[in-house]
């Protein structure tokens, strides 16, 4: 042992005495023992190559923590044997520890058991998988994104394959999958080399990757996705940049004649982009890897070659025997040809590769049993220490086993062949079954990706059920979502069965806890798309914020209304806490109005029910309102309701039945007040804040309707109650919140309450005093100014929208969309939505709708705010006005009680009393899914609408000032009217809205005169509109709810007689006459 003495001699120089093939220079490199009967050569070869891979060795060294499985812990066994490689003075080391760990890990699959020969390639792959589960136990091997996972950060190739027909252009759906070894048939490789030579091309090492790609797709033809008859090759695209690429060579025979040809054609450099049809990672596009290791098979035995980096020598490992071959690759080729070694695995590594990041790695060793128990105690399959994206269904303890059960049973198909072939039958059958197994494993990987997609769809419906069940416990639900979802990219809420949605994200983000880095990279659009996956696909407008859908408290990582609310909460007492509006979502099912009524009553006292005033400004900032009908076909619940409406379009005629119950439901102003706030929250909870974007118009159900002159008609259909009930109560609420602190405002509110009481008691008083109107106007103006100072475009009262009207809003939107088409007005839908939502609130406060708008001190404030909301130029205002007016006419006529509050806010601040018809019907209950839209059959019937459209166009040239200062006949009526009167109502509203387009005058006379100016267009409606304040108004608080009513509700209320007040018959009767 002279070399040992020399090695121990101080100052000994190995380089001077190096002899190729001698043992002297190999002293630092250890062999692995393989005692008779152990048959561990397949394992020894894999371990030796892993040790020689600098990237793997350094990565394993820096990882200090892992989940340990005791005797079955391959991670511990590798750590131990690597430490022995580094520090032991023994020439050969036993590999018993890792062999026992491998056998214990796969005892259920009966793989790699003691004393049995097995396949080195499969051993290598399975060891990588085991290493993954020790480092990142909570992640599926196909979905791992941990930066500390050696397996996926260094070895895994993330691919997708797709077929594209060059003949017809059809393409198949891309199938993503992950693989650790790219298998190539040696026969196909040699054939490709021969074809290249036939083309008189000289084989170059840089062409090796292209040859491998060609061999990989040889004879791999698929049918055209469109069945055009063409046979096309599969395309495989690499999406990441692995630092170690493993090529597996599949032999058709143990004694193949191609051995020498294959060995000679192997290249020591691999150009990564040439190996695939395309690479998407920028680093991969220029990645060139070097051959650093090779495992060979010969005569039922495995051996390995590895490139020793420090000495730049090729080393040969044959169990305990370690020999240095030389510095040149030719020496290895000669050895292989001479000994008839068949290359089995080729390891190409990035020479500049580095160790994995420990940023998200475990810091200590944790026993598997402890880890499993803690995970089970958490009850939500959440990783204890490690952050994870995707968790398996049955918890952490079973995840590794699930992966094994998923993948390894396929290995059993060929394991028996492989076992006996190693013992004497030959390598050919094993290799043939091996490539079959590779394909099966690849298929399994694809199935995993498909299952993940299916799981998303499943969870989308499960999420609805979960949220519906947890509606009463939103606070606790939010905490659970915070904890459970902060680790998931997909951001799906926890499903009842413990499934987590894989891959999207994006509106359910971690709340208050912050998302992890791999979570933060998820695009917002992807997040919002996932959340809305339950309904039809939609493209969110750039400025659109998703509220009520995003289950967030502070909107971390998302620019949502909820996050805006949290920022504006200090500025506006009326800002709604949309961050808490997470419980209610419209379900894609037959809607039960009764259940919704009881639901709204339960929510009356919820602290989360605050007026919402921020939804409109947020949504209004998007300039592309004209495209919104296309971009936002579904606003969460909109499409669900819209679908029901489409199904029941024919039944939209019976609008009377909803009123009967409504008259009984609303008992007083207090109830209306509670409902106003309550509905507001329900609407925000259901995510309807963004429904303003549904149509091309910029208005929201809450948003005030701009009548012809730009005066805002607050058609808040919050509740089919006394005209002023909701607005007054809202004003009262706002006042209580500090929006209006002046005593004068308090007096105004008190006056309103008294008026409402009188109205509800018997509607004895048939007209409001001008003083009352002025007070209301002043109060609302003040309130609006407060909101304006707070940066809000509209007071909260005008934005308080009941859930009922959310539904109605969406239903109405759909119908209004139909209705607006004849008029070529893209804003009508949006305005109608607003009207439909507001019509329930007969009380029309121009200023409350948009107090700042009515104030003529801000000449263009109305339009400026409205245009800001709409994101439109002032020139488009007439369209908005037109639609608004149409809406108003429709709703005003549809509403039996017409409360016309005319107060023109002039630049001098003088408010002129408006015409006010005061016969108010009793408060009505919330019609959650009432449809106030006009049937399609009626959209063509309202010819005055077209005429009014022309009038609006004519008036569209009015200056902004005139628009903002013009008096608005805010004809506020209960939104529910008989279907018969929809057309007339619409016309009336158009006529009424048109009057503001006439010379800006806020006086009643001017209003009447303006109404008269429109007489040519709507004669019958004009009569009713121009009625004096003392004239009675008929109560017609009916609206079309057929499309959203359940059969039970329809049967119960359909036969209820219409409510009518003799004295109030004037308005609607005149309109009908």
Swiss-Prot record:
Residues 407-418, 553-563 have a biased composition (Polar residues). The active site is at 41 (nucleophile), 301 (proton acceptor). One of its GO terms (biological process) is protein deubiquitination. Residues 524-541, 612-627 have a biased composition (Low complexity). Changing residue 303 to Y: In PFIC7; uncertain significance; decreased ability to deubiquitinate 'Lys-63'-linked polyubiquitin chains. Changing residue 647 to R: In PFIC7; uncertain significance. InterPro entries: Inactive_ubiquitin_hydrolase (IPR052398), Papain-like_cys_pep_sf (IPR038765), Peptidase_C19_UCH (IPR001394), USP_dom (IPR028889). Changing residue 908 to A: In PFIC7; uncertain significance. Changing residue 99 to S: In PFIC7; likely pathogenic; abolished ability to deubiquitinate 'Lys-63'-linked polyubiquitin chains. Zn(2+) 2 binds at residues 132, 144, 149, 152. Zn(2+) 1 binds at residues 66, 68, 73, 76. Its EC number is 3.4.19.12. GO terms for molecular function: K63-linked deubiquitinase activity. Zn(2+) 3 binds at residues 165, 168, 224, 228. Changing residue 154 to R: In PFIC7; uncertain significance. Residues 391-437, 485-636 are annotated as: Disordered. Expressed predominantly in skeletal muscle and heart. It is found in: Cell junction, Tight junction. Deubiquitinase that mediates 'Lys-63'-linked deubiquitination of tight junction proteins, such as MARVELD2 and LSR, and which is involved in the survival of auditory hair cells and hearing. Specifically cleaves 'Lys-63'-linked polyubiquitin chains composed of at least 3 ubiquitin molecules, while it is not able to deubiquitinate substrates with shorter ubiquitin chains: recognizes ubiquitin chain in position S2 and catalyzes en bloc cleavage of polyubiquitin chains from substrate proteins. It is linked to Cholestasis, progressive familial intrahepatic, 7, with or without hearing loss: An autosomal recessive form of progressive cholestasis, a disorder characterized by early onset of cholestasis that progresses to hepatic fibrosis, cirrhosis, and end-stage liver disease. Some PFIC7 patients develop hearing loss in childhood. This is Ubiquitin carboxyl-terminal hydrolase 53. It comes from Homo sapiens. The gene is USP53.
